Amino acid sequence: MSFDMDHEQFASFYGPTTGDSVRLGDTDLFAKIEKDLTVHGQESLFGGGKVLRDGMGVSATETRAENPMVADLIISDAIIIDWTGIYKADIGIRDGKILAIGKGGNPDVMDNVDFIVGASTEAISGEGMIVTAGGIDLHVHYITPSIAQAALDNGITTLFGGGTGPANGTRSATCNPGAWYTHRMLQAVDNAPINYGLMAKGSGSRPELIGEQIEAGCAAIKTHEDWGATAAGIENSIAAANKYDVQYAVHTDSLNEGGFVENTINAFNGNTVHTFHTEGAGGGHAPDIMVVAGQDNVLPSSTTPTNPYCKNTLDELFYMTMVCHNLNPKIPDDVAFAESRIRKQTEAAEDVLQDMGALSMMTSDAQAMGRVGEVAMRCWQLASKMKKVRGPLDGDSKYDDNNRIKRYVAKYTINPAICNGISDYVGSIEVGKYADLNIWDPKYFGTKPDMVIKNGMITYGIAGDPSSSLPTPEPVLERFLYGAEGRAVNHTCVTYVSQYAYDHGIKEQLGLNKTILPVHNTRSLTKANMKLNNYTPKTIEIDPQTYDVKIDGKLITCDAAPTLPLTQRYYLY
């Protein structure tokens, strides 16, 4: 005779199941579980007197050496939030990669087992917890090495950007200057407990100028107006990107000195381009850079300073711009330059375009107008705001915001991975990919992950007083853990380089210890490749006098948010 359990009691033991909804932090968003791949009555619960014991949920006979389906780690009964779906499953990890997603346990006594829990398997209790893929930030100024910890604080596990420290060039532009600095930066990040990729400086009128940086190990190219965003620089950078199969990103000409947005689009010549802070407050043709989001070949992203649009956004942006771009408040032309980039109309429209899926990615612009520790948080704040402003998306309903949730999680996971040619490795929770995962308590979702797993090992997470008798006493802080220590970093973290540098032995040439992987498949991408964020308006019009934005003839705007979720309730200081 089967045992009937009260639904509430079941959820308290094993976490929610199909049809149950989970609130994300203090937002207005609810994730509804679409399916449950575990087997009811045979859940792989760990703990005293529970299931994962020898001969019960743990196989007494299968060895890791003899059976490739024996996992190194099981995350049991987890709620997975990914662009691929919102569902419940056990996650099996082996050799740092996702081995299986479904039911983990002992096939000798359990039904429908997808991977085996053996004597060599570690356990993380995922009951009632949310698992997402590690976040990817494609717009990071490498000003301080401490940025790695700030990123991990919000579940960001991969950084792409450029720079050499607090030099003025780095404070303005996310690009690495030359082969010598590229080599030094590859060595500098070799022990950093996070994935890194470097972006070459896309300036000059010969592709060879950019190409030498790609050959030195850069994994992408960035043109920035502070170094000159001319048509020639764009065209030659794209030529180098096409030759070496790396992504090309651009921060366009705010002052319209070398041409207008139409000239820049012509310089793209139909090639794949990642446009940074596409709204324009972070930089770009004033006032109409956002029209590039209507181009099929453009992969558009936003940055955290303008998302979501709030009552204090405009005031903050002016001072950010002055500092980041080495401007002098005593020079009227410098002040005018900063003011030209700040437009409430385009910032309001940007929120809506993100919600429509016309803007495909979210990035930080870290320490140069944005905050690397807010990428995930800002995404979910924006999603919650847009639910209030625009209501449920098509297919969503009360206690079911799955379509909106999947759209927004894609903005900082799978889409950046696709954009920069690393989606074969990371960016989603799929079998065969590296296990870069975040585990969240739902009430802290989007703010502070309980654990950050890098290539299958806990690298960062919540831990209590090291001198206490338990792991839980205060002070409970986010701390670096064993995956971030010693030579483990060589296996838990990755540096991405160009295929050329990989093939020509950059790891051996520079004596690097980290895992080195090549980027690829970046040059034939279009907006259609952006998962759940591929809406391409037929027309985007920005009035040069009023800055009003129209999409396919319809005015697009929203009010500044007076308050936001995921704020002071979670961050007291």
Swiss-Prot record:
Residues 134-573 form the Urease domain. Carboxylation allows a single lysine to coordinate two nickel ions. GO terms for biological process: urea catabolic process. Binds 2 nickel ions per subunit. Its cofactor is Ni cation. One of its GO terms (cellular component) is cytoplasm. Keywords: Cytoplasm, Hydrolase, Metal-binding, Nickel. The keyword Metal-binding applies. It is an enzyme of class 3 (hydrolase). PROSITE patterns: UREASE_1, UREASE_2, UREASE_3. Ni(2+) 2 binds at K222, H251, H277. Ni(2+) 1 binds at H139, H141, K222, D365. This is Urease subunit alpha. It comes from Limosilactobacillus fermentum (Lactobacillus fermentum). The gene is ureC.
